[in-house]
From Swiss-Prot:
Keywords per UniProt: ATP-binding, Cytoplasm, Ligase, Nucleotide-binding, tRNA processing
The name this protein goes by in its record: tRNA(Ile)-lysidine synthase
SMART domains reported for this sequence: TilS_C
Organism: Ralstonia nicotianae (strain ATCC BAA-1114 / GMI1000) (Ralstonia solanacearum)
Location of the protein in the cell: Cytoplasm
HAMAP family registered for this protein in UniProt: tRNA_Ile_lys_synt
UniProt binding sites for ATP: S31, G32, G33, R34, D35, S36
Gene label: tilS
Keyword Thylakoid: no
GO biological processes: tRNA modification
Amino acid sequence: MLLVDKVAQRVVACAAFVVSGGVPTVAVALSGGRDSAALLHAVAAWRDAAGVPVRLVALHIHHGLQADADAWEAACARMAAAVGAAFRVRRVRVSTDAGRGIEEAAREARYAALDALCAETGATLLLTAHHLDDQAETVLLQLLRGAGLDGLSAMPMARERRVTLLRPWLDVPRGDIEAYARAHALAWVEDPSNGDARYARNALRPLLAGMAGHFPAYRASLARSAAHLAEAAALIEEVAQTDLARIAPAGTLAVAGLAALSGPRQRAALRAWLAGAGLRAVSSRRLEDLRAQLLGARADGAPCVRLPGAQVRRYRGQAWIEAAGQPGAGPADCPIAVSRFDPARAEVQRVDVAAWGGALLFSPAQAEGIDARILQAPLSLAARRGGERIVLRPGGPSRALKQAYQEAGIPAWARARLPLLYAGERLVFAAGLGPDRSAVAMGSGWHVAWLPAVGQDGLDAG
């Protein structure tokens, strides 16, 4: 029962498993293969043995890449029914139009579909059957591709995003899962592509089998190295965020501040800055080109560096990220209601506003924050219409918003995508400038930030 015990320990330890006032929904990603079939069985065994009040749902992604895909879906439905789990399926179209390989494209489509199904079913926790051999393969593949620390860190045991992803068997060898499946006489489907050497993982497996004779502990050793690299990556990220707090406090990046850093810290800060805007898949070559153009252009130059899905501009000593192909148009004139912020909850709150392509981040502030009483009025985001005025220093006069943007060095092409936050009819915050000081509380209040989203979140390997 070792594998069932691992499921029990790691699921219960997840904060996402605890649902206040209700029964948690735990989802299992079920491809129909041996590993995921064993995981579904083990989760159900834990549920039944412990009498845990949990709703179990099996999620199957139909890629349509194999002739037997419909039969696999039917097999997965039977597996779910056998253990009393709900069953949901999502059909996806795998596109390689963006220059990605079929494996990467299928993985991205699969994770996006799993996230969507979790949202539909109310699942707070998603389990996948990745194991120690998968982790070893991932580390070696990333090494052969010349990946950086993030790639070489491979797959984390848990990942916090829209739903918590947990890999409870990431330290379990494939052989243990095979033994579990045989011991319980489980049925599963065989994917013929697993023997196709055109796929990178399959091509690597015979080499790993040979390696095991000389290095029997290679799986655990590679996983241990990945853990060390993940810790190093976390340290670099911490340093980068400290640098960004100083050189990019309002979202735009001060080029002079970047130039004052060492080369490695420049690259780390740029990666973190781009990642904060959703741009995670930026190659080393593109990053170096961006660094060179930001730091090497003439003082009066205005370089524009194109990246996948976005572009970076430099203007008056500041670097800006904007979505590619969008010349500076905001959403429709009608205000967009901001209804998911609760000033009574003293915690960081993120409110995504799809119409504006970004999010508002509300953080409790001991000083210099917008008065919570003012924020109790209906909140809305709106575009500039002309004639707005704002107070930017305590006790100071109001000034024209257009003039304030000009003095702040915000270029005209960027202003149209900077929303204004209103509490009722009162302007309380202007993206790119900050709060209206007449709305700032003497004591505690709320710090507001605007986070433009110009790309999509990255996906974990696997």
